[in-house]
A protein has these predicted regions:
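Alpha-helical metal-binding/catalytic segments enriched in His/Glu/Asp
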Residues: 49
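Extended beta-strand/beta-hairpin segments
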Residues: 1-44, 55-156
Length: 156
C-alpha cells in the first residue's frame, strides 16, 4: 500500500492512497482548510476497520440490524509527540431481535482475527471494548436492551 500527501500551503495537505485513489484533506489546525488532523484519521481508520468487520459478520449471522455506529474515544499523552495512550471502542447496534451473543462473537473476531488496524494498535496501547444493543420499537423509537464493557485487548 502506498500513500502520498501533497502540500497545499500552510499546514494543509491532500492525501491519496493507491488503493482507493480518493483525495483526503489533512490540516494540522482543524477547521482552517476543512481537513482532518492526522491522529483523527488514525482513530477513524480504527473505527472504520472494525465496523466493516462487525457489520459483515452480523449480516452473515442474519441479524436484523437497522442501525450501526462505532465510536472510538482515544486518549492522548499530554507531552509531545502526544501519542494515543488508550482507546475505548463502543459498538452501538440498533435492530430487531439482535442477539447479544452474535454481537460479542463479531466483536471478538474483529478484534482478534480480521481488523489489522485494531490488531496493530492494540500492541501499542490498551483498547477497551464496549457495546450497546437497542431494540427498534414502533415509530422509529428504540430502547436499550444490552449494555456492557466487554474486555480490554491483551497487549503482546
Amino acid at each position: 500500500m502506498k500513500a502520498t500527501v501533497n502540500w497545499k500551503g500552510d499546514l494543509a495537505f491532500t492525501g491519496t492512497g493507491d488503493v482507493s485513489n480518493l483525495p483526503v484533506s489533512l490540516d494540522a489546525d482543524s477547521g482552517t482548510t476543512g481537513g482532518a488532523r492526522p491522529m483523527e484519521l488514525i482513530a477513524l481508520g480504527l473505527a472504520g476497520c472494525t465496523a466493516m468487520d462487525v457489520i459483515s459478520i452480523l449480516q452473515k449471522k442474519r441479524q436484523n440490524v437497522t442501525g450501526f455506529d462505532v465510536q472510538v474515544d482515544a486518549s492522548r499523552a499530554e507531552e509531545h509527540p502526544k501519542v494515543f495512550t488508550s482507546a475505548v471502542i463502543t459498538y452501538i447496534v440498533t435492530g430487531v431481535g439482535v442477539e447479544e451473543s452474535a454481537l460479542l462473537r463479531a466483536i471478538e473476531l474483529s478484534a482478534t482475527r480480521y481488523c489489522p488496524a485494531q490488531s496493530m494498535l492494540s500492541q501499542v496501547f490498551p483498547i477497551e471494548l464496549k457495546y450497546e444493543i437497542y431494540e427498534e420499537v414502533e415509530d422509529g423509537e428504540r430502547r436499550l436492551t444490552h449494555q456492557s464493557a466487554w474486555q480490554e485487548l491483551p497487549q503482546e
